[in-house]
Structures are given as structure tokens and as C-alpha cells.
Amino acid sequence: MTSRTAYLAAPLVMVLLLPVVGLFVSPSAADIVAGAKHPLFAPALWLSLQTSVLSLGLIVVMGAPLAWWLANSSSASARVVELVVNLPIVIPPAVIGVGLLEVFGRRGLLGPWLESVGLSVPFSSAAVVIAQVVVAAPFFVQAGANAFRKIDDDLMVVARTLGESGPGAFLRVALPIALPGLIAGASIAWARALGEFGATLLFAGNMTGETQTMPLAIYTALESDVRAAVVMSMLLAAVGVLLLVALRFAPMAWKWTRDLGGLS
């Protein structure tokens, strides 16, 4: 990188970095302790962990087969499905929240039927999970499809020739090769679910202990106690930074582990 290019890039790098630096530099130790004791902190943290882990589990279970199919199909329908999967990336989360209300709300597409069997989805913990799945799933599916596309087809053919069934070849050949990409996609999807705000607010509401996740608690705390909002923001930022660092070094660790396994 030339000095001129560095000067041009520096302002953008600073704009991206300063908000994160500000979170960790501005508050004092007393502010952090006081913020962590705020009544919104613990319930929001626990709910966020519960819902985001459940969302991630659903995304992985449903998304891995979809990613495999997208990677191995060249049909027009696969390309259409891939476009649909990526829609939540480009559609604003608030719009997704309104759309979910139009599907699951009392007057929505499924609302009357759900109400007839005694189910109400909006403004519940289930709505939090649904919102997180919708906004986060594309990141896992896309990463998984890219990982599966890198697998040499000849390896699968050899596995089948040696007597492996289709599922067996997938589990013993394809999955280990694609695992680093799947883990990276799952990490990004989990971080996205953990930080989801707009769709959750509109579809699930902002009820303490029931639908108020960490981002919503930050929004609420800003009106009464900025210290609590800063502490919760620090926690989410720290999770993001740690995930990025882990993803940066995960490929090297994976290669090192496989090399050790080959030597043993």
C-alpha cells in the first residue's frame, strides 16, 4: 500500500474503529460496575443467550442441508432459492419485522389459523427466535454453500466407490472438509442473531424478561441510565471482537490440528 493510498484509507478505518474504542475507553470502573448492576442487564443477557443459541441450533439443522443442496445443484430453482435466502441481507430488519407481523399477526396470513389452535406468536419469546432466525440464517447458508463448493467432486466419487452411502460420504468426507467454513458461518450467524434489533422490536416487542434482548435493553437503558447501556454495548462489542479474532486464526488452528492428526 502506497502512502497516498494509506492516507485515503485512514479516515474510513478511523470511522470504523473509533466507536469500538470509545466504548472501552470512556467508562470508568465505577461506571462499569454500576451498569452491570442495572436491573435490565441480567434478564436481557440471559434471554439473549437463550434465544440466540436456540436460533443458531435451528439455523444449523435446517441450513446445512440447504447449503449442501445449493452447492451441488446447478438448476434454475437452486439459483432462485439462493436469491430468496439472501433477501434478509438486503431488506432492512424493521421491514422484516413488519413482514413477520403480516404473516403471524392476528390478521396475517397464518394468524387466524394459529389463533384457532390457541397459538399466538407475535410479542413472545418465540417471536424473538423467529426474527433472529430470519435475519441470521442467510449468513450461515451462504458460508456453508461456499464451503461445500470447494470440495473436490472426485473425493465424493471415491468415497462412494469404496462403499460409502450418500449420507456416509457426506459425514466422513464432505463435512470434515467444509467444517471450518461452517463454523465461520455459524459464528457470524450467532453474532448477527445476538445483535438483532429492528425485526425483534417490531415483531416481538420490548418486554423485560420475555422479549427484551440485549440490543433492546441498550435502547431502553439509554433513556434512564447511559452507564448500563454502555456496559451492555461493551459486552456485545467484545463478543464481536473475539469472534473476529477467533475466525482469523481458526483456519490456521484447524490446519495445525489436521497436520497433527496425520502425524499420529
Region annotations inferred by a language model:
Residues M207-A221:
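Short hydrophobic, aromatic-rich alpha-helical segments embedded in or entering the lipid bilayer
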Residues A76, E164-G166:
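Short coil/turn motifs that cap or connect alpha-helices
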Residues L162-E164, P176:
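Glycine/proline-centered hinge or cleavage motifs at structural transition points of membrane proteins
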Residues M1-A30, P39-R149, V173, I177-G198, ...:
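Membrane-water interface segments at the C-terminal ends of transmembrane alpha-helices
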Residues I151-L155, L260:
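Short glycine/proline-centered loop/turn elements that form peptide/ligand docking sites
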Residues A159:
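The alpha-helix within a helix-turn-helix
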